[in-house]
Amino acid sequence: MQQQPSTQAASRPLLRGGIAALCLVLGAGLGSAIGWRAAMHRSAAQRTLPVLFNAPTYRDLRNQNGDKVSSQAFDGKVQVVAFLFPYCNTFCPVIAAHLVGFENLLASSGLADKVDVVSFNVDPGGTGPRQMREFLQEYGWDASNPRWQYLTGTPAQIRSVVTSGFHVDYQKVMDQGSAGDSSSAALAVAGSDPQPQVVNPLATKADVPYDITHEDVLMLVDQRGRVRAIYDQADAVGKFALLKAVRSLLGRAG
């Protein structure tokens, strides 16, 4: 079953504070968080996606190849926005692999030049362009292809864009488990809730003594820089459902 965009918090062992805070922010524009949900339901009935909030603007971030990128680079395009940790052993590799499949579907649909995948590195203090490039390559993407921009910056820049701008929480958690157990830090936060465990060769090789816990969300940003959909289980979003939503933003049938 394909996942639909939702404002409901997923029962995931991840931080949900940013999206909860987002409901309060949106209350100013829609009257309340209930109003936002009602708008989503009305929109679904009308087969359109509501405007949720403006995506943040930024400049002088760096992509996986070390090139400077600003938010203006995506003007006039639909963006599929993700938040990824290069050494992740849970959701991020699954999300990346799914987005590669989605990009291939875009290409076969003739829409590749109208849509960009934009992801943000939620470990800006510990990893940089080299690790980001290796991560994309590990999960099937040609890192030189400009249709996927994996962005990083200083910790302050990324915190401003990701948490203040997109309302997505993340935090660094030091590993209190045994050496080499890169999932134990996340489990310390998650408790007994199950998480998918994915073998990430980059994480195995680096063996860093920490994890980054973050919200498992995917967002759609329209050609005018407005967030139009939030999927709160990014690793479960089907590529055909995502393509349908993208087509609606592009004014295409199908």
Role assignments for model-derived ranges:
Residues 1-58, 62, 253-254:
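N-terminal targeting signals for export/organelle localization
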Residues 69-99, 117-118:
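Short active-site neighborhood of thiol/selenol oxidoreductases, capturing the structured segment around
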Residues 96-161:
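Structural microenvironment flanking redox-active thiols in thiol-disulfide oxidoreductases
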Residues 175-254:
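Thiol-/selenol-based redox modules, centered on thioredoxin-like
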